[in-house]
Amino acid sequence: MSSDAEMAIFGEAAPYLRKPEKERIEAQNRPFDSKKACFVADNKEMYVKGMIQTRENDKVIVKTLDDRMLTLNNDQVFPMNPPKFDKIEDMAMMTHLHEPAVLYNLKERYAAWMIYTYSGLFCVTVNPYKWLPVYKPEVVAAYRGKKRQEAPPHIFSISDNAYQFMLTDRDNQSILITGESGAGKTVNTKRVIQYFATIAVTGDKKKETQPGKMQGTLEDQIIQANPLLEAFGNAKTVRNDNSSRFGKFIRIHFGATGKLASADIETYLLEKSRVTFQLSSERSYHIFYQIMSNKKPELIDLLLISTNPFDFPFVSQGEVTVASIDDSEELLATDNAIDILGFSSEEKVGIYKLTGAVMHYGNMKFKQKQREEQAEPDGTEVADKAGYLMGLNSAEMLKGLCCPRVKVGNEYVTKGQNVQQVTNSVGALAKAVYEKMFLWMVTRINQQLDTKQPRQYFIGVLDIAGFEIFDFNSLEQLCINFTNEKLQQFFNHHMFVLEQEEYKKEGIEWEFIDFGMDLAACIELIEKPMGIFSILEEECMFPKATDTSFKNKLYDQHLGKSNNFQKPKPAKGKAEAHFSLVHYAGTVDYNIAGWLDKNKDPLNETVVGLYQKSSLKLLSFLFSNYAGAETGDSGGSKKGGKKKGSSFQTVSAVFRENLNKLMTNLRSTHPHFVRCLIPNETKTPGVMDHYLVMHQLRCNGVLEGIRICRKGFPSRILYADFKQRYRILNASAIPEGQFIDSKNASEKLLNSIDVDREQFRFGNTKVFFKAGLLGLLEEMRDEKLVTLMTSTQAVCRGYLMRVEFKKMMERRDSIFCIQYNIRSFMNVKHWPWMNLFFKIKPLLKSAEAEKEMATMKEDFERTKEELARSEARRKELEEKMVSLLQEKNDLQLQVQSETENLMDAEERCEGLIKSKILLEAKVKELTERLEEEEEMNSELVAKKRNLEDKCSSLKRDIDDLELTLTKVEKEKHATENKVKNLSEEMTALEENISKLTKEKKSLQEAHQQTLDDLQVEEDKVNGLIKINAKLEQQTDDLEGSLEQEKKLRADLERAKRKLEGDLKMSQESIMDLENDKQQIEEKLKKKEFELSQLQAKIDDEQVHSLQFQKKIKELQARIEELEEEIEAEHTLRAKIEKQRSDLARELEEISERLEEASGATSAQIEMNKKREAEFQKMRRDLEEATLQHEATAATLRKKQADSVAELGEQIDNLQRVKQKLEKEKSELKMEIDDMASNIEALSKSKSNIERTCRTVEDQFSEIKAKDEQQTQLIHDLNMQKARLQTQNGELSHRVEEKESLISQLTKSKQALTQQLEELKRQMEEETKAKNAMAHALQSSRHDCDLLREQYEEEQEAKAELQRALSKANSEVAQWRTKYETDAIQRTEELEEAKKKLAQRLQEAEENTETANSKCASLEKTKQRLQGEVEDLMRDLERSHTACATLDKKQRNFDKVLAEWKQKLDESQAELEAAQKESRSLSTELFKMRNAYEEVVDQLETLRRENKNLQEEISDLTEQIAETGKNLQEAEKTKKLVEQEKSDLQVALEEVEGSLEHEESKILRVQLELSQVKSELDRKVIEKDEEIEQLKRNSQRAAEALQSVLDAEIRSRNDALRLKKKMEGDLNEMEIQLGHSNRQMAETQKHLRTVQGQLKDSQLHLDDALRSNEDLKEQLAIVERRNGLLLEELEEMKVALEQTERTRRLSEQELLDASDRVQLLHSQNTSLINTKKKLEADIAQCQAEVENSIQESRNAEEKAKKAITDAAMMAEELKKEQDTSAHLERMKKNLEQTVKDLQHRLDEAEQLALKGGKKQIQKLENRVRELENELDVEQKRGAEALKGAHKYERKVKEMTYQAEEDHKNILRLQDLVDKLQAKVKSYKRQAEEAEEQANTQLSRCRRVQHELEEAAERADIAESQVNKLRAKSRDVGSQKMEE
């Protein structure tokens, strides 16, 4: 794990990659109980953390973090990993590996935004749904060249490892990024490409930019390919805003040195259906919305489009904007990518034009010609735009769409298309254009990325659409999910199967582990023969196959036979599903609608021909190789069977072929897996759904991958490679002189290295390693290389320096020689002979010079001749050179052409290799098919023999059938006559069903479809014959003898099918037609009768609805009148209270009117019920009729389809019979269809009428319910109003009484405050004096402590001087010895050192003298301070006497307090009762007013709802009128309607009379209000009497409280006495604390001295050792001094041992004393803090409480002081207990010391200690009892405080209620608030005083006795403590003296 400094290279990404070092250390040091910490299963969170409490048999009780106790089985509890494994980077390293550990590790890392985690051999990444700074350039640089274990987990680390493996292993690599849709695969793919483009750049830049050429570097183009492909291939889905709707496999090729060479992209299965259709929460491809973002306005003008996506239906069926995508910025990125990738401007414009044309295709509209099935264009403007953009003639394009040319036989005919067919054709063309353009762009990108540079290896990056489960899953989802299934199987096979198989193949001991991850069943269900794809392709071969036939074949073949194929359960609100597949990631429901068309992918070949002739080059190029019906034949003649086979390929076949190529590529590489996870479905950052993540982990095999990584050996190396690479670790293990094979060498090498034997295994050809060991070997190799390189560098540097040194020596010798010669010359230069020599020597050289001139002339002549020869030679050579250069150029041209040919040959070779792979796959498929055909052939031979036997019998049956045909013809004539009669009856009904002709036409089309089906069956037979002929031709090549038998078999099969079908058809069709005719006649009669009845009922309902409408209008008018009255009531309510009576009267009138209105509507409700019963009866009859008709129609259709299918098969032999029966069948079917349309029309009209009736009935019921609610509310309002008035009067009377009482209380309050202030002043003066004395005492003690510390410091300084002196003496001794040994050489140095030592000695002596003088002065100051302490103690005693006088005054004050408290209780009881009554009355008043306002609001809402109902009823009446117009027989029921109308008029008149009666009721309400007023007055008088009674009760309660207060006064006096005693004890304890502090200081001082001595002795010991070593070397010289030093050394050792013993003892004493002092100090500070806190609380209470309650507060404070004094005494006892325990420990230590020093005192001290032990034990027992009793008292006090808090909460609730009253009762606000405040204060004070008095009485009595006993015991303990202290001092003094 790297440190924070090493992580600095990652920049700001460091905290997102690895935990900081501090956090890791804290995690390791965190407390952790491995036996209790666990994970447990939980229903909500799946797994939660907990602590094991107990284990019982097989059950475990666990407490979770949210304090839940769970009882679980053992298998539901999982142990937790230690904290150091929190957020671990590789989950394979965890101690406990299970699901919750993996889940929580991922969750905690995700919470810290560490999204990458290793999981064994692969990496897991969680989508953060936010931007993280972990992909910056500095992060790329940081990961470059790093090993996996050296850097945190990251996609860059995976990429770099793949890159390094490619270079070292010389093998192709692949990175498989898998996961569900929205997991982040596309982003990680882009990061991988970014990494490779950064680290493996070639550095070559393009020098110039030309159109159509590369416009950027290779790495730029690789990176920019992503934005372009994402714009045209990515879209928003439900789970992902940028989902890849195609798969891609990006191969990045590298050269031999690892430099980037080229790249190419393979794409798979673009989802082209998204071009024309999107779900509501999705959108189409990004490019459409980027263009419409108007970032490039010139594109809008060029493409003739608008910026509103809703103008184009193809791209606006779902959402049109995505919050996380800026379409305008993405358009710029896409446009820039097109430029960088080298597209020419013409190609760029072509791309945009085709994209715009696809958008215009969605706007093309067509309509149906009048009286024809033919479609025609509905406007040509859109077609003109599309034609302009695509370079087409729009008229020809429209003609080709509406009337395409179709080949029939050898001729072409024009086929008519209906609107739906033309629309489908347009959509198919748009999808085809977009798909081909996308594939062309991929091809162009690959051309640009192919740099023709030499390439050695490649790394493939796979990014394919993730597993998808939508509400509507089609063929695209099946292909995507099948791809993911194959990839998951590849992962499982690679990780689990191949890995373990290789172990066995290599001979490693291994038990095969079945991880249960085999997905073969699902894969075989989809792709194997007779699988889903196989059945789909088989159905596509038949021209008229349907989705239903495809579904039936699937069910027949797989339902119930394969566990992975299921029948889906119908779900409400979801799309229909036809079958379900159980995939590894879940069960998916698939809808097969349109699969056959999608798979065949048919196009309008007429329009495609126009595309091929388009003036837009790009469009014509895209469709130039299209192989349709026209080109198929011609192509077939040219290239034979190959062209024909290629044109027959379906979409699924192409997809499977591409998928097989992909899997072949992946198997040829070394894969690296990255598993992407979705944390939640809501795209929320930082949130993790446990169930969702766990499902993905289980499906992806993460846990199994970790397990096999831990158990297996994931790393392996060939023996030769291992020997070559790691021999450097121990070269001596492999002998040099002899041959040894690689395996033995590797074994010897590994055995010689310090590596665990369990971490590796030896196979047959490789050595296998556990995870992490190979990295360890790499580190060891790196370390070895470092050492070897260092030694090599040292040898080289040494050699170079020796060479340099040799040269330097040679130069030095030369210099010496030159210097010697010059010196010699200088010496002889002035000699006379030398002068003569200088003069003669030049003369001697002149003769020699002449000789030299002669020789030079000769040489000059020779050189001249040679020059001439060389010139001639040069010219010859120049001529040769020119010719050679010409030859060289020719050779270079030849070499260049040869290299080009070689490159072409290599490309052809590569193409041949690829084609070879494809051909091998095809050969494999053909061999499989051949085997299947052979099996089928053998089966057919057997069937042929059986058919030969049956042939003879069938011939006999044919003769019988001919006889039956004659009978059938006779019966046919009879049925024709019956049909004529039926047609005459049907003409009578044609007038009533004129509007249903469209449905009739559709049924006729269905009839036409059945005829087409017959033709399809014929085509199928012909197709089967052709296929059979092909198979026979193939089998002829293998077995020629079977050819004749196959022909016979085909003939027999056809004869059999025709005969059997003819027999069934002729029998069943005749019987069915007769039965159908009779049933139809009967049903027609019934339907006519029911239709007439239904028409009459509808007319009745229409009349009723008109009447209802009139009534509603009248009621609405009346409601408006009531509204006006309510508004008048609102205005009157705002005025004076005198108008209340009028308002009540009006409300009463309204209530009476509403009651009468509700009574009137009851008659209407009864009538509605009658009509509803009639409607229900009619509905049941109609439903029964429709059900019967539908059943008969279904049976007719089914039987007809069967007969048609069977007739089609026997069309050759029974053609004449078939034609006659077809005519009869078509006529009967037309009649049946007409009848079905009539019945459906009737059912629709009936359902409409029923809906209108139901809505009217619901509206009337709602009006009635609302009327009843209104009357009830009015009644309640009147009752509340009456109660409110009575309460108002009572409150006013009571308020007056309370005001008088308040005035009396204020007067008494003023008198009390004056007395209280005087007492306060006295108390403050006394407390100030007492505090001043205490402060003086504390300051004196503090001064004493300071002086003591100064004394100790002086003592330490003195000790330091002594040590310095001893050190100086030792140095003098050393110098003396050295002086004696080196007297001659260092005489001067020793003298100087001696002088320095003398100076230092003198300084040391002066320091000792000054220290002694300071010690004397300190002793004097100590004595003076002791005198001052004694004076302060006397002052303290005087302050105690002053406190006693103050207590007397306080007792007098308590008496006055009791008197006033009695008065307080009386007033409190009265006010409390008054407050309760006023509060209840005010709440009732507020409720009444709120209810009144709600009633008014409801009236208003009723008015609005009535208006809405009126509008709805008017709409309903309009609908009923329309239905009435369509029905012609309404006049029959007019009389009934008129009668009902008269009844309704009578009911309306009754309603008006009831409303008038309501007005009279309002008058009666006024009288009742006056009576309510009188009753309120009477209730006020009763309340006054109740108040008087409450006053008397409160007086009695006050008397009882007075008696309680007297008892409290007595107890307070007792507490005062106890307080005095406690204060005395406290003083004694403080004195003891001072003694203990001084003793502690003395022990500390003693410890410091001992430590100083120890240091001195240690220094002496070191010096002695050094001197001993010197003396040993000079033993002969200083033998006498050596003896002296040895004696000194022995003395020092003895002293050292003594000081060591004393040091240990003193350290133990110091620890005990410091513990004791610390306890005493903490207890003392806690007591002081509690005392201060209590005093602050008392002061705060005195400030907050009103002046009238001051005396009671003083009493409370006295009680609290008594409690605190008792607690202080108990704490002092506990303190003494602790000191005694410490003294006992100190005693044990002192015993050991005393044994060594004085054996005589052993027995005496032991006896004393035993006696002390017994007393201490007694004291401890008693103290424990006291502590328990104090705990009980504290609990009671806590309960009392809870009660007080409870009352305070009640008071808060009262204040809240008072605030509400303040809003509602303005006139009573001030008075009620004052009363409430006073009552609250009085009540709280009385309750607190009463509770505290009761508790204090009982507690003080108990504590008093206990404290007396505790005081006695404390005296005994104190005497014992003093004795022990005296003994300890004696012992300490004795040790000091020794």
UniProtKB/Swiss-Prot annotation:
Q: Name one GO molecular function term.
A: calmodulin binding
Question: What is the protein's major site of localization?
Answer: cytoplasm
* Domain Myosin N-terminal SH3-like as annotated: residue spans: 33-82
Q: Give the disulfide map.
A: none
A single Gene Ontology CC annotation of this entry is: muscle myosin complex
> Which keywords, in A-to-Z order, does the entry hold?
Actin-binding, ATP-binding, Calmodulin-binding, Coiled coil, Cytoplasm, Methylation, Motor protein, Muscle protein, Myosin, Nucleotide-binding, Thick filament
The segment(s) forming the IQ domain are: 785-814
- Keyword Nucleotide-binding assigned to the entry: answer is yes
- Annotated InterPro entries: Kinesin_motor_dom_sf, Myh13_MYSc, Myosin_head_motor_dom-like, Myosin_N, Myosin_S1_N, Myosin_tail, P-loop_NTPase, XRCC4-like_C
Q: Where is the composition biased (Basic and acidic residues)?
A: 1927-1938
Q: Which residues carry this modification: N6,N6,N6-trimethyllysine?
A: 130
User: Quick one: where's region Disordered?
Assistant: 1917-1938
- In this chain, ATP is annotated as bound at 179-186
Q: Name one Pfam family in it.
A: Myosin_N
The keyword Ion transport appears for this protein? no
Tissue specificity annotation: Specifically expressed in extraocular and laryngeal muscles.
- Which compartment or compartments is the protein found in? Cytoplasm, Myofibril
Region annotated Actin-binding sits at 659-681, 761-775
Q: Share the domain note from the entry.
A: The rodlike tail sequence is highly repetitive, showing cycles of a 28-residue repeat pattern composed of 4 heptapeptides, characteristic for alpha-helical coiled coils. Limited proteolysis of myosin heavy chain produces 1 light meromyosin (LMM) and 1 heavy meromyosin (HMM). HMM can be further cleaved into 2 globular subfragments (S1) and 1 rod-shaped subfragment (S2).
Q: What does this protein do?
A: Fast twitching myosin mediating the high-velocity and low-tension contractions of specific striated muscles.
**Family (UniProt):** Belongs to the TRAFAC class myosin-kinesin ATPase superfamily. Myosin family.
The protein's matches in PANTHER family, at most eight in alphabetical order, are given as: MYOSIN HEAVY CHAIN, NON-MUSCLE, MYOSIN-13
Annotated protein name in UniProt: Myosin-13
Q: Which organism is it from?
A: Homo sapiens (Human)
| Lineage of origin | Eukaryota, Metazoa, Chordata, Craniata, Vertebrata
**What gene, per UniProt, encodes this protein?**
MYH13
